[in-house]
Structure formats: structure tokens, C-alpha cells
Design a protein with these regions (language model features):
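Short alpha-helical transmembrane segments in multi-pass integral membrane proteins
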Residues: 1-19, 76-141, 189-244, 301-367, ...
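Transmembrane alpha-helix boundary and packing residues in multipass membrane permease domains
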Residues: 22, 26, 37-38, 55, ...
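Generic alpha-helical transmembrane segments of integral inner-membrane proteins
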Residues: 23, 27, 31, 35, ...
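Helix-terminus/linker motif at the lipid-water interface of multi-pass membrane proteins
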Residues: 27, 31-49, 116-125, 181-192, ...
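Interfacial/gating helices of multi-pass transporter permease domains
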Residues: 40-59, 126-130, 194-196, 236-243, ...
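Small-residue-rich hydrophobic transmembrane alpha-helices
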Residues: 48-108, 145-164, 262, 275-339, ...
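Short runs within selected transmembrane alpha-helices of multi-pass transporters and secretion channels
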Residues: 69, 138-157, 164-172, 197-212, ...
């Protein structure tokens, strides 16, 4: 889907064409996470808490892949708008080299030092034991993930979002089936609890990787080929590093900072951790539309900027922001609407249920803050290659404001859990003035392609 000159109404047609598959993909991801929590809910509160804490490493690693994929997507979307497929393959190889190296390192740490990893989040020995068994198996997942996430990012950058969605759908559906099998001991299998979740995830990601190679074999343009690992371009490597390193730093800094929320809550007790593990799942459902619009918008705007039409990109960015505000409001209402159902099925103790109720209500407004910032920082700004702003903005906001405030409130003032959580959830609104000012200046709109690479 190479994007050519568009009429005024084509913006919404192209946005929906890109957004719908991404929404489905994100909903599937949220549904699988929900299924994990629902099934672990019947295993016990400790299993939910341990997997929730151990999953912070997966979340950080995902943000590493997302940061690398951002640099690849920015370049590939603009070069696709220009019709340069050779440059896309070179960028794919560069990205794979980085992602595979990082995956290998993290997988080794997860296999040999899982207890040390869990100690970062909790002193509770039961949670450490459960989480360590989960992490050791997840090392296999990390190896597969490092390859598939790059290939899926390249597919999305050239508009093949439906194929990307189908591959994720395969992994997600298989994950749910295998989770049920290993958690509850279906089809004669033993009941493995949290360890079963890790096995199911590893197997589903392995199947997804095989499916990626099949799609690559059938594809006429974007392929997943080992030879791309050995294609070198000094110019494109420099461009990739210039775009990816700030994006990678931004995403990892934000993700690690967000994981620090779990550190704070983890030291406030297992009730807070268990409640938060359910809240994260519900919040992910509420933000599905916002993140889909940001992802689709970055692809669409990147294609337009690659053609050199910067004024049109600014016009489309304005419409995209309006869509995001509406999506944020809808997301908050979704969280509010499903809160009674979550409270009905949860089997937590009374204290954790109390935390759960009010944490969910806090997230009805938090989603709006996250929606606007995500659309602008991860969508609009990055489409034009402006990745440094997000790094500076999020790092200052999270590490100089939210994290110190959370630790101070929890361990110095010793405020109640819900007050600590409320203060942590003010981070998105603190950076609004800065983000909106940068958007209005319009310096983010740039054509980052080169005539010769």
C-alpha cells in the first residue's frame, strides 16, 4: 500500500485501513493477557503476583524491541513512500543484528540468574521461587521474540498490517489454548500453574517465528532472510542509530521507570501487587484504540513525509490528535463500564479487592493523559524522525518527578497504598504542556530519506 496523493477525505479512509488491523491485534494481545490473569486467578494470588512481577522483564524487553522497531519503521515507512525496497532490506538487517544480540544476553541472564532478577522486585521468597521458574523458561521466548518483532515492524511500515495482525492472532490464540492446557492440566497434561504460562508463551512464540518464515517465503517484497544480516550500509546504519538510540532510550527509560511502580507497590505488600496486575490488564484494553491510532498515524505520516509533503503531514497530524482525544475518552468509559465485571470475577482478598476498585477508577482519567502523549510522542513526532524529544521529556517526567514522588510518598510520608498509586498516575498530565507546545511548533515534520544510500 504505497500512499500517493490523497484527497481530503482519504485521511480517514487510510487511517481506518491501517488502524482496524492494529486494533484487532492489540485487542487480541490484551485478551491473551486477560486470559492469563483469569486462569491464574484460579491458581492463587501468589501465582498472579509472581507472574505480574516477572513480566516486568518482558515488558522492558518489548520496549527495547519497540525502540529498535521504531527506528526501522521510521526509515522504512519513508523509504517505502519513496519506493526504495533495497534500503528497507538493509534497515531490516541492521535491526535484526541489534535485536538478536540483546535477546541472547537477556535469555542467558533469565536462564542462569532468575532468582536475582526477581529480587529486584520483591523480597517475598514464595514469589521469587514462582517467578524464577517462570523466567527460566521465558528465555526461549526472548530469542524468538527478537526476530519476530522486527519482521512484524517492517511489515507494518510498508502497510501490510493485516499480515502482521494474522501472525499475532495465530500466536495469541495458540497461547490461550496452551495456557489452559498447562495451567489446568487438560488433555492429560500435568497442572503446571505459573510455569505452564511460560511454557505456553514459549511454544506460541516459536510457532509464530516459523509462521514468519513461511510468510517471508511467500512474500514478493519484504522477506525475513538471513542474508540481510550481512548487508552493510554506513549511511543507513548512522541514520538508524540516530533515530533508534533516542527512541530505544526513551522506551526503555519509560518502561524501566514504569517497572519501578511495581517495585514501589511490591514493597507495599502482595495485595497491592495482585490488584495492580488486574488493573494493568484492564488499562491495556482501555488504551487499545489510542495506541492503534498512534501506530497507524506514524506509518501514514511517515509515508507522506517521505514524499516531501510536510504541510499535508501537519494537517493530518491535527486530525490524528482529534481522533486520539476521542479514543482516550472512549477508553476511559470502557474501563468504567467493565469495572463491575472485573470486581465480580476477581478472587482476591478483601484488602486487594478494595485496592482494585479504586485503582480502576483512577485509570478512567489516566487513559486520557496517556492517549494524547502517546499519539504525539510515539506517533506524530517519531514519524518525522524526532525521537530525541520523547527521550528527554519522558526521562525527566518519570525519573525526576514520578519515581521520586512515589518513593517519597510510600516510604517517607508512608501514605496509604491508594494515595501512592494516585500520585504515580499523575505523570502523564505533568508533561502535557511541554508536549503540546512542541507539537504546535511543528519542527518535527521532516523528510529523513536520502537520495542515495
Amino acid at each position: 500500500m504505497q500512499i500517493t496523493a490523497m484527497k481530503k477525505d482519504d485521511f480517514y479512509r487510510q487511517m481506518f485501513k491501517l488502524t482496524i488491523p492494529i486494533i484487532i491485534q492489540n485487542l487480541l494481545s490484551a485478551a491473551v493477557n486477560s486470559a492469563d490473569v483469569i486462569m491464574l486467578n484460579y491458581v492463587g494470588q501468589s501465582a498472579i503476583s509472581a507472574v505480574s512481577l516477572a513480566s516486568n522483564f518482558s515488558n522492558v524487553l518489548f520496549m527495547v524491541y519497540y525502540g529498535l522497531g521504531t527506528g526501522a519503521t521510521l526509515l522504512c515507512a519513508q523509504y517505502y513512500g519513496k519506493g526504495n525496497l533495497e534500503a528497507i532490506h538493509t534497515v531490516e538487517g541492521i535491526t535484526l543484528r541489534f535485536s538478536m544480540a540483546i535477546s541472547g544476553i537477556v535469555a542467558l541472564i533469565a536462564f542462569f540468574l532468575p532468582q536475582k532478577m526477581m529480587l529486584l522486585f520483591t523480597p517475598d521468597q514464595e514469589l521469587i521461587t514462582i517467578g524464577a521458574s517462570y523466567l527460566r523458561i521465558m528465555g526461549i521466548t526472548y530469542l524468538c521474540w527478537g526476530i519476530t518483532e522486527v519482521y512484524l515492524a517492517i511489515l507494518r511500515s510498508v502497510g501490510r498490517v493485516t499480515v502482521s495482525m494474522a501472525l499475532n492472532m495465530l500466536a495469541f490464540v495458540l497461547n490461550v489454548i496452551l495456557n489452559a492446557t498447562f495451567i489446568f492440566g487438560l488433555f492429560g497434561m500435568p497442572k503446571l500453574g505459573a510455569t505452564g504460562v511460560a511454557i505456553a508463551t514459549a511454544l506460541s512464540r516459536l510457532v509464530e517465528l516459523v509462521a514468519c518464515f513461511i510468510v517471508s517465503f511467500l512474500s514478493k517484497n519484504v522477506k525475513l532472510h538471513p542474508k540481510y544480516l550481512f548487508v552493510h550500509s554506513k549511511v543507513l546504519t548512522q541514520d538508524f542509530m540516530r533515530l533508534s538510540l533516542p527512541a530505544l532510550g526513551n522506551d526503555v527509560s519509560w518502561s524501566v521507570a514504569f517497572s519501578m511502580y511495581s517495585v514501589i507497590l511490591g514493597h507495599l505488600g502482595t495485595d497491592a501487587v495482585a490488584a495492580n496486575s488486574l488493573v494493568v490488564v484492564v488499562r491495556n484494553i482501555g488504551t487499545v484504540f489510542c495506541f492503534a491510532i498512534a501506530s497507524a498515524g506514524s506509518i501514514l505520516l511517515g509515508n507522506i513525509m517521505g514524499q516531501g509533503d510536510l504541510e499535508k503531514s501537519k494537517s493530518y497530524a491535527s486530525r490524528m490528535l482529534k481522533m486520539t482525544v476521542i479514543a482516550g475518552a472512549i477508553g476511559g468509559l470502557i474501563v468504567l463500564a467493565i469495572t463491575p465485571f472485573v470486581l465480580r470475577f476477581a478472587t482476591l482478598n478483601d484488602t486487594a479487592m478494595h485496592y482494585l476498585k479504586y485503582m480502576l477508577l483512577i485509570n478512567t482519567y489516566y487513559i486520557m493523559g496517556a492517549a494524547v502523549n502517546t499519539a504525539l510522542i510515539a506517533g506524530v513526532f517519531r514519524a518525522g524522525g524526532d525521537t530525541k524529544f520523547g527521550l528527554i521529556c519522558d526521562t525527566i517526567d518519570m525519573w525526576c518527578y514520578a519515581i521520586p514522588l512515589g518513593f517519597f510518598a510510600a516510604f517517607v510520608l508512608k501514605l496509604p497504598v491508594l494515595w501512592v498509586y494516585f500520585l504515580l498516575c499523575t505523570d502523564e498530565f505533568v508533561k502535557w504542556p511541554w508536549v503540546i507546545k512542541h507539537y504546535r511548533e511543528g519542527k518535527w515534520a521532516k523528510n529523513i530519506t536520502r537520495e542515495e544510500v
